[in-house]
Curated annotation (Swiss-Prot):
Species in which this protein is naturally found: Streptococcus pneumoniae serotype 19F (strain G54)
UniProt cross-references to CDD domains, sorted A to Z: FTHFS
Signal sequence range: none
GO terms of molecular function: ATP binding; formate-tetrahydrofolate ligase activity
GO BP terms: tetrahydrofolate interconversion
EC supergroup of this enzyme: ligase
Domain of life: Bacteria
Pathway as given in its UniProt record: One-carbon metabolism; tetrahydrofolate interconversion
Gene3D superfamilies recorded: Domain 2, N(10)-formyltetrahydrofolate synthetase, Formyltetrahydrofolate synthetase, domain 3, P-loop containing nucleotide triphosphate hydrolases
Name used for this protein in its record: Formate--tetrahydrofolate ligase
Length: 556
């Protein structure tokens, strides 16, 4: 089997103008970035707003192994297969962060014969959106420090500045830094730090904004810190939301590319799901819904994180809710959740599959709580055995959830046809009746407790003293009616990454609350979730190179 990049480089791409023609998009509607990438103009986005709204399919997963379970691959393969069976389909997914690409992932544009192309560009600098977000974020940092240096008219307490700088890399050395050193000419010394770009609130804002005016409104609402009297300071107080929106004026437009089989795809925005809401842009998803009969999108990590946030935070900003949720499961992840060590996941172990099924079952139950039908997709690996597959299908039948084997990684579009047919049938026979998990009018504590007890199945929430103080501050400032965005490990329902499977009777500790008023939610931090990742012992970057003719090597 060829590597992902070898497969990608063997495909003859169509000009993006030709790919999107079937959607009613013309050359004049596009802002081209070479022959194979483009942004869609705002004029076209506005023109299609009166079109009917298509069906929405959300792809999520069980709690993953560190390598991931092929959610993006299944999303792409399912969309290709839907087109294959005659359904006019688009994809709306996130764009990769360069840090994890150079770190552990090595690429994040699908895999095998289910990829979005040109994968080298998508995984590297693409259309420059990440750089625009990084620049806007750091421009705000520079403007804050300049305000301090020039007399601090707003009375900002430099000890209570929340806003951090960002870079689109995994760089643990930058987590805690001191800026403003070197004497009076170099500013006011203060503690600072760097997050990875996809953890920036500006990324979340870009993915939730509906147009330039909404973007400016959200940017103005960002809380950058507090004054000496403990009152909040916003970007609007600094009067720089216009400048930040100017930096982002092109980044807000959705990017268009294609799959190996010519399915049009929006690849736009990419907040992490363990520290932000983990979904691609509202603008891309909404536009896809107006252009196609079926839109396939995804939410980061497992359904306890990405899907819950998609349904509680993103869906209220969309013209429709998901008609079906596809839960991606792999036998290796089920075995890991069933107690098998990482180095033994390729060995047949039917009992571990049965034990790990408790994890999948809980995710299915959770999706049904939102009133949406679920379909299980088994992402096939070469190490899977017939006995393991049969056991999983038998267990799915016991809870009356449709299940299909998908081999889109190895077999491309043909490997997803049965899944596509099952999803279409499920949507036709089981109309969704979407309902949110909680009402925003509940208190902050009640909303967090609802997520912990209903989705994670924990028994209790503990609030550290710092979090209790911050809840009082949130209430005092009138922010308590915002939804909650949980920051939690992706590997477990609990806040302990080692508690795999379907743990019960556990307690979750909230250590900190961070207001993200621009994004429109409150982040509740649990455990040791990092907003700036580090590199592994052997980064994927060690295998990367470029030849003299520009051919990229080592992405996978």
């Amino acid at each position: 089997m060829k590597t992902d990049i070898e497969i990608a480089q063997s495909i003859e791409l169509k000009p993006i103008v030709d790919v999107v023609e079937k959607l009613g998009i013309s050359y004049d509607d596009l802002e081209l970035y070479g022959k194979y990438k483009a942004k869609l103009s705002f004029d076209k986005i506005r023109a299609v707003e009166s079109n009917p709204v298509g069906k929405l399919i959300l792809v999520t997963a069980i709690n993953p192994t560190p390598a991931g379970e092929g959610k993006s691959t299944l999303t792409i393969g399912l969309a290709d297969a839907l087109n294959k069976i005659g359904k006019k389909t688009m994809i709306a997914i996130r764009e990769p962060s360069l840090g994890p690409v150079m770190g552990i992932k090595g690429g994040a544009a699908g895999g095998g014969y289910a990829q979005v192309l040109p994968m080298e560009d998508i995984n590297l600098h693409f259309t420059g959106d990440m750089h625009a977000i990084t620049t806007a974020n750091n421009a705000l940092s520079a403007l804050i420090d300049n305000h301090l240096h020039q007399g601090n008219e707003l009375g900002i307490d430099q000890r209570r500045i929340l806003w951090k700088r960002v870079v689109d890399l995994n760089d643990r050395a930058l987590r805690h830094v001191t800026v403003g050193l070197g004497g009076p000419l170099n500013g006011i010394p203060r503690e600072d730090g760097f997050d990875i770009t996809v953890a920036s609130e500006i990324m979340a804002i870009l993915c939730l904004a509906t147009d330039i005016e909404d973007l400016k409104r959200r940017l103005a609402n960002i809380v950058i810190g507090y004054r000496y009297d403990r009152t909040p300071v916003s970007v609007g107080d600094l009067q720089v939301e216009g400048a930040l929106a100017l930096i982002l004026k092109d980044a807000i437009k959705p990017n268009l590319v294609q799959t190996i089989y010519g399915t049009p795809a929006f690849v736009h925005g990419g907040p992490f799901a363990n520290i932000a809401h983990g979904c691609n842009s509202v603008l891309a998803t909404t536009t896809a819904l107006h252009l196609a009969d079926y839109t396939v999108t995804e939410a980061g990590f497992g359904a306890d994180l990405g899907a819950e946030k998609f349904l509680d935070i993103k869906t209220p900003n969309l013209p429709t809710s998901p008609d079906a949720v596809v839960i991606v499961a792999t036998l290796r992840a089920l075995k890991m959740n069933g107690g098998v060590a990482k180095d033994a996941l390729t060995e047949e172990n039917v009992e571990a599959v049965r034990a790990g099924f408790a994890n999948l079952k809980r995710h299915v139950e959770n999706i049904r709580k939102f009133g949406i039908p679920a379909v299980v997709a088994i992402n096939e690996f070469v190490s899977d055995t017939e006995a393991e597959i049969a056991a999983l299908k038998e267990l799915c039948a016991l809870i009356d959830v449709p299940v299909e084997l998908a081999s889109v990684w190895a077999d491309g579009v043909e490997g997803g046809v049965e899944l596509a047919e099952t999803v279409v049938k499920t949507i036709a026979e089981n109309p969704a009746n979407y309902k949110r998990l909680y009402d925003n009018d509940l208190s902050v504590q009640e909303k967090i407790e609802k997520i912990v007890t209903e989705i994670y199945r924990g028994s209790k929430v503990n609030f550290e003293k710092k979090a209790q103080t911050q809840i009082a501050q949130v209430v005092q400032n009138g922010w308590d009616k915002l939804p909650i965005c949980m920051a939690k490990t992706q590997y477990s329902f609990s806040d302990n990454p080692n508690a795999l499977g379907a743990p019960e009777n556990f307690e979750i500790t909230i250590r900190e609350l961070v207001p993200k008023l621009g994004a429109g939610f409150i982040v509740a931090l649990t455990g040791d979730v990092m907003t700036m990742p580090g590199l592994p012992k052997r980064p994927a970057a060690l295998n990367m190179d470029v030849e003299s003719d520009g051919t990229v090597l080592g992405l996978f």
